[in-house]
UniProtKB/Swiss-Prot annotation:
<feature type="binding site">
    <location>
        <position position="240"/>
    </location>
    <ligand>
        <name>substrate</name>
    </ligand>
</feature>
<dbReference type="GO" id="GO:0019509">
    <property type="term" value="P:L-methionine salvage from methylthioadenosine"/>
</dbReference>
<dbReference type="InterPro" id="IPR005250">
    <property type="entry name" value="R15Pi"/>
</dbReference>
<dbReference type="InterPro" id="IPR011559">
    <property type="entry name" value="Initiation_fac_2B_a/b/d"/>
</dbReference>
<dbReference type="InterPro" id="IPR000649">
    <property type="entry name" value="IF-2B-related"/>
</dbReference>
<dbReference type="InterPro" id="IPR037171">
    <property type="entry name" value="NagB/RpiA_transferase-like"/>
</dbReference>
<dbReference type="GO" id="GO:0043917">
    <property type="term" value="F:ribose 1,5-bisphosphate isomerase activity"/>
</dbReference>
<dbReference type="InterPro" id="IPR042529">
    <property type="entry name" value="IF_2B-like_C"/>
</dbReference>
<protein>
    <recommendedName>
        <fullName>Ribose 1,5-bisphosphate isomerase</fullName>
        <ecNumber>5.3.1.29</ecNumber>
    </recommendedName>
</protein>
<keyword id="KW-0119">Carbohydrate metabolism</keyword>
<feature type="binding site">
    <location>
        <begin position="137"/>
        <end position="139"/>
    </location>
    <ligand>
        <name>substrate</name>
    </ligand>
</feature>
<feature type="binding site">
    <location>
        <begin position="214"/>
        <end position="215"/>
    </location>
    <ligand>
        <name>substrate</name>
    </ligand>
</feature>
<dbReference type="Pfam" id="PF01008">
    <property type="entry name" value="IF-2B"/>
</dbReference>
<comment type="function">
    <text>Catalyzes the isomerization of ribose 1,5-bisphosphate (R15P) to ribulose 1,5-bisphosphate (RuBP), the CO(2) acceptor and substrate for RubisCO. Functions in an archaeal AMP degradation pathway, together with AMP phosphorylase and RubisCO.</text>
</comment>
<dbReference type="GO" id="GO:0019323">
    <property type="term" value="P:pentose catabolic process"/>
</dbReference>
<feature type="binding site">
    <location>
        <position position="65"/>
    </location>
    <ligand>
        <name>substrate</name>
    </ligand>
</feature>
<feature type="binding site">
    <location>
        <begin position="22"/>
        <end position="25"/>
    </location>
    <ligand>
        <name>substrate</name>
    </ligand>
</feature>
Length: 324
């Protein structure tokens, strides 16, 4: 008999895949919550049955977005603890409690991390700063919001972030806190860099050498910031650091549907020898980044390997906890 997976797991997976749930932190918390619901609603009669359900649920969630490492790191956080309990001979209710509690713990730590990043990062923002940001990052927003709450007179330049327009979400959120916002097209980033004091952006993944994988366009903004000698600050929780890159694995860049760029009706009328490429992310080299702000403090990009060893060193010794 196959594992009975609750509908919330499939719904969450679909929302992550379609980008209804977007942003590395929200994706991670949604994945942890889906595992929690699976454990809560499971009709399993034996520990092995629940363990198998959680493994299948993890695989369904894992296969949704290849680039956002926050997703597998959330699954690892929960499943590593559940696996230890299962192999230790836990009974059904203990196993269920371990899954639910681990998921709640991850979600709590994730939300607290954003607050802490805001507190740490705001110390690097000065009164009168004009800040440029890209896409929609809760961690990056936390830095700007905290600085504004401290009474610093800041203004934020927000790029539209084509083709999914995440910049609109960022602009409206910052404005709701009372922060003055300038909204620009992506291609105007270099034009307005000369009036920018600092760049603050988020990350989907951070590699062992300190490179940042984030929304397409991030590397161009970081490059033009370097050209103008403008500080680039990346705000990211430690669960966005990519453990597999310690072993040389390359991060897969997700290619999304062309209809996100050109509406399907219009695309049908285009000549067949035009291809529309739509990468969701790009890679910003560590030399274009000045600091990475984490909940554990501010580090230079080359110190990313130290965070990875401390946080995920155990992951190098084992296969994924949901693998057979």
């Amino acid at each position: 008999m196959g594992a009975m997976i609750v509908k919330e797991v499939y719904e969450t997976a679909e929302k992550i895949k379609s980008m209804e749930i977007r942003g590395a932190g929200r994706i991670a918390r949604a994945a942890a919550q889906a595992l929690m619901i699976q454990a809560e609603k499971s009709k399993a009669k034996e520990p092995e049955e629940l363990w198998n359900e959680l493994k299948v649920a993890s695989k369904i969630l894992y296969n949704t977005r290849p680039t956002a490492v926050s997703l597998p790191n959330a699954l690892r956080y929960v499943m590593h603890r559940v696996k230890a309990a299962y192999l230790g001979g836990a009974d059904l209710e203990t196993l269920r409690f371990t899954a639910i509690n681990s998921a709640k713990e991850f979600i709590y730590n994730s939300e607290k991390a954003i607050e802490r990043i805001g507190e740490i990062g705001a110390k690097r923002i000065e009164d009168g700063d004009i800040i440029m940001t890209h896409c929609h990052s809760k961690a990056a927003i936390s830095v700007m919001k905290k600085a504004f709450e401290q009474g610093k007179n800041i203004k934020v330049i927000v790029t539209e972030t084509r083709p999914k327009w995440q910049g609109k979400i960022t602009a409206k959120e910052l404005a709701s806190y009372g922060i003055p916002v300038i909204y620009i097209v992506d291609s105007a980033a270099r034009h307005y860099m000369k009036m920018t004091d600092k760049v603050v952006m988020g990350a989907d993944s951070i590699t062992a050498n300190g490179a940042v994988i984030n929304k397409i366009g991030t590397s161009l903004i970081a490059l033009t910031a370097k050209e103008h000698r403008v500080w680039v600050m990346i705000a990211a929780e430690t669960y966005k650091f990519h453990p597999a890159t310690m072993l040389g694995q390359l991060v897969e860049i997700e290619m999304r549907d062309p209809t996100e760029v050109i509406p399907e009706e219009e695309l049908r009328t285009w000549p067949k020898n035009i291809e529309v490429w739509n990468p969701a992310f790009d890679v910003t080299p560590p030399e274009y980044i000045d600091v990475i702000i984490t909940e554990r403090g501010i580090i230079p990009p080359y110190a990313a390997i130290d965070i990875l060893k401390e946080e995920f060193g155990w992951a190098l010794k084992y296969k994924e906890p949901w693998e057979d």
